[in-house]
Amino acid sequence: MDDNKTRALTAALGQIEKQFGKGAIMRLGDNQAMDIEAISTGSLTIDIALGIGGLPCGRVVEIYGPESSGKTTLTLQAIAEAQKMGKTCAFVDAEHALDPIYAGKLGVNIDDLLVSQPDTGEQALEICDMLVRSGAVDVVVVDSVAALTPKAEIEGDMGDSHVGLQARLMSQALRKLTGNIKRSNTLVIFINQIRMKIGVMFGSPETTTGGNALKFYASVRLDIRRIGAIKDGDEVVGNETRVKVVKNKVAPPFKQAEFQIMYGQGICKEAELIDLGVKQKLVEKAGAWYSYNGERIGQGKANVVKYLKEHTEMSNDIEQKLRAELLLKKTVKAEEPAKADEE
């Protein structure tokens, strides 16, 4: 770039910063462009699939799936992880179905959790916006988009037609919310339900509620499905669950994660550690026996899970090694070309 253009650009950048404040415009290569802060989902496999070690702060995240697939469980686990980091969390319960006892079992500190049960969709989104603008709340969960009923629909009669009202409400709210979310660095998670489109001949007939706005504004979209049952004898004690990263603006998308959700306990982290440990050759498997650092830790996966629950130091050690191996590798690779250029 010639000198005149450089001077003109510097003057323009100075004017923009003077008028709109520092950070209104920046070069992506500047040191101020920090790595995106992430909050763990409580599942190691999902954190790895997301590429940055969790859900990104200052962004909108959508989690959708069929009924009883684990959507609320996943968000409550994320809240529990955020609270461990000393963060303030809020739960906007539009479905009026939050179970505090279950949330407590998943590790959520109920006493510190902010909960709102709004009457209308407008009220829910206004509360969400006020919490975000305060800059004091780090995680806001809206459960769910399908339950955000517009005021006109609530005040109208049962048979009245209200075409596109919810989609318009979501579009308007997200236009208003996104700038505030970025400025306050708040993680906003929308839980959504699945509906079927009528008359679809080719492709998937599934769609999410609330129009298309959320699909565009979300930086991360997770599709969560139940793929099987976990049985103890004849009794079903949990679900095998698969999460697909359908959209990801902060890392490569389309990755998958499989894990177990145990009833009354949440995500079984120990089972993930065993599977990933064997895959990465951190945990040795010979027949039905599992060993770590040359020490036998159990026969059969169920016994090893029990052993790791009792020996938290070992499970933390395995988790740290897996995170270092599977997450930091990406950062190192990203930095290598820059070092080559400097030379």
Curated annotation (Swiss-Prot):
GO terms for biological process: DNA recombination; DNA repair; SOS response. It is found in: Cytoplasm. Keywords: ATP-binding, Cytoplasm, DNA damage, DNA recombination, DNA repair, DNA-binding, Nucleotide-binding, SOS response. It holds the Pfam family RecA. It comes from the Bacteria. CDD domains: RecA. GO terms for cellular component: cytosol. GO terms for molecular function: ATP binding; ATP hydrolysis activity; ATP-dependent DNA damage sensor activity; damaged DNA binding; single-stranded DNA binding. ATP binds at residues 65-72. InterPro entries: AAA+_ATPase, DNA_recomb/repair_RecA, DNA_recomb/repair_RecA_CS, P-loop_NTPase, RecA-like_C, RecA-like_N, RecA_ATP-bd, RecA_C_sf. Gene3D superfamilies: P-loop containing nucleotide triphosphate hydrolases (3.40.50.300). Belongs to the RecA family. NCBIfam families: tigrfam_recA. Can catalyze the hydrolysis of ATP in the presence of single-stranded DNA, the ATP-dependent uptake of single-stranded DNA by duplex DNA, and the ATP-dependent hybridization of homologous single-stranded DNAs. It interacts with LexA causing its activation and leading to its autocatalytic cleavage. This is Protein RecA. The gene is recA.
